[in-house]
């Protein structure tokens, strides 16, 4: 297990507890009371830390290296029913964007999402979860296929942003994202979107239009990352914590502003602390969202989606 800077008190107590247990096994000394006391202190420390997280700390948790990624959710929720589909039929197969058909609680879905890597080699292979235009065009191809066969769409968002390289711009990055938004608003099947990690800017919006939009508790959704915001406003990344607070990017902020429909609770410590519980909770929210949409006529589905996005935001003097 890797620890973030604010989790170091937890790490110290867990190490103390581990040593206490080892001493108990290797000697005749009764360390049960000591172990219980350390464990009690550990549980209280976890509550004190995780119940009072700052916006920046939630950003850090969303990027935790042990956090489950899109394919982890797909494997856990769909099992062996998932069939991955590849390519945009125009340029190439973008490894930062994955998608395919799978069943969740017996219902077929077309699933699309950004995928990050687990180590240096796979992070480069997945381009750090930053999709190129062909990734967004692949996503749109799969969503249009789902529309053709009447299959609902599930999108899993986890990206630090769309790839900003020159070659991506030359191949039409902005157009690809804009086209996806345009088409998703009009897609004739239910769309459920879940932000499972980072939800940065147009990179997230390119697969982020949904009839139901959920955020996991320790994720963020914003037009810009705190570091980039800090570098623009204060010419330094040192103010990233201040930027995170100002951006109102946490799941609770997004729900208060009615930019997402609900927040999916995570186990204490984050999704990676209890993956099985996280996967089950996410699957339940997917089924719940789909059940709320499945009986709507196509006209009502699209009208409600249009209204949802037309009514977002408010103007204040």
From Swiss-Prot:
Domain CoA carboxyltransferase C-terminal as annotated: residue spans: 37-292
Q: Which residues cross the membrane?
A: none
Pathway(s) served: Lipid metabolism; malonyl-CoA biosynthesis; malonyl-CoA from acetyl-CoA: step 1/1
Show the InterPro entries listed in the entry. Acetyl_CoA_COase_a_su (IPR001095), ClpP/crotonase-like_dom_sf (IPR029045), COA_CT_C (IPR011763)
GO biological process annotations for this chain's record? fatty acid biosynthetic process; malonyl-CoA biosynthetic process
- One term under GO cellular component: acetyl-CoA carboxylase complex
| This protein's UniProt keywords | ATP-binding, Cytoplasm, Fatty acid biosynthesis, Fatty acid metabolism, Lipid biosynthesis, Lipid metabolism, Nucleotide-binding, Transferase
Reaction catalysed? N(6)-carboxybiotinyl-L-lysyl-[protein] + acetyl-CoA = N(6)-biotinyl-L-lysyl-[protein] + malonyl-CoA
Subcellular location(s) of the protein: Cytoplasm
Recorded hits in Pfam families, A to Z, give: ACCA
Enzyme class of the recorded protein, top EC level: transferase
**Any one GO molecular-function label of the UniProt entry:** carboxyl- or carbamoyltransferase activity
Enzyme Commission number(s) from the entry: 2.1.3.15
Which SUPFAM superfamilies does the record match to this protein?
Answer: ClpP/crotonase
Family according to the record: Belongs to the AccA family.
General function of this protein: Component of the acetyl coenzyme A carboxylase (ACC) complex. First, biotin carboxylase catalyzes the carboxylation of biotin on its carrier protein (BCCP) and then the CO(2) group is transferred by the carboxyltransferase to acetyl-CoA to form malonyl-CoA.
The record's note on quaternary structure and interaction partners says: Acetyl-CoA carboxylase is a heterohexamer composed of biotin carboxyl carrier protein (AccB), biotin carboxylase (AccC) and two subunits each of ACCase subunit alpha (AccA) and ACCase subunit beta (AccD).
Classification via PANTHER family: ACETYL-COENZYME A CARBOXYLASE CARBOXYL TRANSFERASE SUBUNIT ALPHA, ACETYL-COENZYME A CARBOXYLASE CARBOXYL TRANSFERASE SUBUNIT ALPHA, CHLOROPLASTIC
Name the record gives this protein: Acetyl-coenzyme A carboxylase carboxyl transferase subunit alpha
Organism of origin is: Flavobacterium johnsoniae (strain ATCC 17061 / DSM 2064 / JCM 8514 / BCRC 14874 / CCUG 350202 / NBRC 14942 / NCIMB 11054 / UW101)
């Amino acid at each position: 297990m890797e620890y973030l800077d604010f989790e170091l008190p937890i790490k110290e107590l867990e190490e103390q507890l581990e040593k206490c247990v080892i001493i108990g096994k290797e000697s005749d000394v009764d360390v049960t009371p000591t172990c219980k006391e350390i464990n009690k202190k550990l549980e209280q420390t976890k509550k004190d830390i995780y119940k009072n997280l700052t916006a920046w700390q939630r950003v850090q948790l969303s990027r935790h290296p042990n956090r489950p990624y899109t394919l982890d959710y797909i494997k856990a929720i769909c099992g062996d029913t998932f069939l991955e589909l590849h390519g945009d039929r125009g340029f190439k197969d973008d490894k930062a964007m994955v998608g395919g058909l799978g069943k969740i609680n017996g219902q077929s879905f077309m699933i699309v999402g950004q995928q990050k890597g687990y180590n240096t080699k796979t992070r480069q292979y997945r381009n750090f979860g930053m999709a190129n235009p062909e990734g967004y065009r692949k996503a749109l191809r799969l969503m249009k296929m789902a529309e053709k066969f009447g299959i609902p769409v599930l999108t899993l968002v986890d990206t630090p942003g769309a790839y900003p390289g020159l070659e991506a711009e030359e191949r039409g990055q902005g157009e690809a994202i804009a086209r996806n938004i345009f088409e998703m608003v009009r897609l004739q099947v239910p769309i459920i979107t879940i932000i499972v990690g980072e939800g940065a800017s147009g990179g997230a919006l390119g697969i982020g239009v949904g009839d139901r939009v959920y955020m996991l508790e320790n994720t963020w959704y914003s037009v810009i990352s705190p570091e980039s915001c800090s570098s623009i406003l204060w010419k330094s990344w040192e103010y990233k914590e201040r930027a995170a607070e100002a951006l109102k990017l946490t799941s609770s902020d997004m729900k208060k502003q009615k930019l997402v429909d609900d927040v999916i609770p995570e186990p204490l410590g984050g999704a990676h602390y209890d993956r099985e519980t996280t996967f089950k909770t996410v699957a339940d929210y997917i089924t719940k969202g789909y059940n709320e949409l499945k009986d709507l006529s196509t006209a009502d589905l699209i009208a409600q989606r249009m209204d949802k996005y037309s009514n977002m935001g408010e103007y204040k003097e």
